[in-house]
Design a protein with these regions (language model features):
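Structured, non-membrane catalytic/scaffold regions adjacent to prosthetic-group chemistry
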Residues: 1-189
């Protein structure tokens, strides 16, 4: 297994927290100790297929385009460190019970991401459309049968100026982005 079971607390198949004792053993959190929080089941390697052919569509730009992961890699890349934290981190300490995994302090990590800066992607598409206000990313999660996607779709929108500091990441801590962490490609802002 690629996760250290002794360092993790399993809340559900889509929610795994890191034990407090396993946080801070190094500046960068090893992948084996990084929490997992997903709304939908993780895509399998067979669903993803050849990662280099994975496609992403860029809209809200002057010349909308679809890029393969291989094409994105040709645009250039950078590596940056960020704090990755679930917005529900600490909810287990609330005086009143709230929905979701009862995270304590283990839904946080320091991660090195490698990918293409969104600025390079936007430039390759002729710049941002003048009507654009936000940058939004959405995955292609496959909803389980019977689930209403309108109730389960998760999108994150940020002001469009953030695109200059964002990236489409394909590596996490020097290895291909694991499926459970959004692989083969995820937005990092």
């Amino acid at each position: 297994s690629w996760k250290d079971r002794n360092a993790l607390i399993v809340h559900s198949d889509k929610g795994i927290e890191t034990h407090r004792s396993a946080i801070g053993e190094s500046l960068i959190t090893p992948n084996r100790n990084i929490y997992i929080r997903n709304n939908m089941p993780t895509m399998s390697d067979s669903q993803i297929g050849d990662r280099s052919n994975w496609k992403v569509s860029i809209k809200g730009v002057k010349n909308p385009k679809t890029f393969s992961l291989a094409q994105l890699k040709k645009l250039g890349h950078t590596t940056m460190a960020t704090i990755l934290q679930c917005s529900g981190n600490g909810r287990g300490f609330f005086a009143h019970k709230v929905r979701g995994s009862q995270w304590k302090t283990g839904a946080a990590a320091c991660v090195l991401w490698t990918g293409v800066p969104m600025k390079l992607v936007v430039d390759a598409c002729g710049g941002i459309d003048s009507d654009a206000v936000f940058m939004t990313s959405a995955g292609v999660d496959h909803e389980p049968t019977g689930l209403d996607p309108k109730k389960a779709k998760v999108e994150r929108s940020v002001p469009k100026k953030v695109y200059k500091d964002a990236m489409l990441a394909w590596e996490m801590n020097g290895v291909p982005l694991p499926n459970a962490h959004g692989g083969p490609l995820r937005m990092v802002t």
